[in-house]
Amino acid sequence: MFITKKHIPRRTFLRGTGVALALPLLEGMIPALTAQAQTAAAPVKRFVGIWHPHGVAPGYWSPVDEGKDFEFSFITKPLEPFRDRTVLISGLDSTAAFSTTEEPGGNHARGAVFLSGIRPRRDAVSPYLGVTIDQLIAQKYGQDTLLSSIQLGIEDASHNSGNCNWGYSCAYTNSISWLNPTTPLPTEVNPRIAFERMFGDGLSAEERRAGRLQSASILDSVTHEIPRFKKNLGSGDQARLDDYLTNVREIERRIRTATNNAAAEVSAEVPFGIPESKDIHFKIMYDLMILAFQADI
């Protein structure tokens, strides 16, 4: 016999003006004494692909030993607390990305192979690749999340036409995610816009902008909802929610600071809203990615 209690739907949002704030997984979302694997709160299948255009040093990633007792390298050391849930695979080759004697160049177009496994067509006018694995996964699991997929980047990749390298279309250089063989998906490089895509509730850009002018923080828009929601939570869930909301506010603060700094330090290369510092830009985008997973966006 199962003892059940009224539980919180997994897709619960805190709502305010122009804001729909997703919540992290809480114990209150799991029916009492119900096997977690049988509930909507069961561990979900999610995917992230991270492309390093200039590659990495394999020796710093691949462990020396095989089997469950391998030793983490210094660069993978942060994963050690999750050893029982981590699999490191090495020794793989993507032959479609190899250069040939007939075509020694075009290395910048090789990023298109990363998630597709397909050698890009050497055509600057009509690029053709294939559906990438992230989009195949999005087709199967994307209906369970607020966004089926989101593409984040660091450098402006809005130009997907023309010849970028050895006769290859710029689309191969600028997009690693393809919806279909002829549609590369653009990356979002502005952390503020990425943040608003995650937490806006579908209103127009103008309405979201007006909401920002009325409220200093996205969280300010849902402040009145938080106490009402928390009173039905246990102490563990209250602490978990507080930690999550703190992370949201901190990332928002850093985005605002970086935006203000970028506006103050006028640059011909960096558009408004994008941090001047590459290090800060990288860190914010990675933290946005973590937040998206935490809230299952």
Could you tell me what each predicted segment is?
Residues 1-297:
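Ligand-binding pockets and gating/stacking loops
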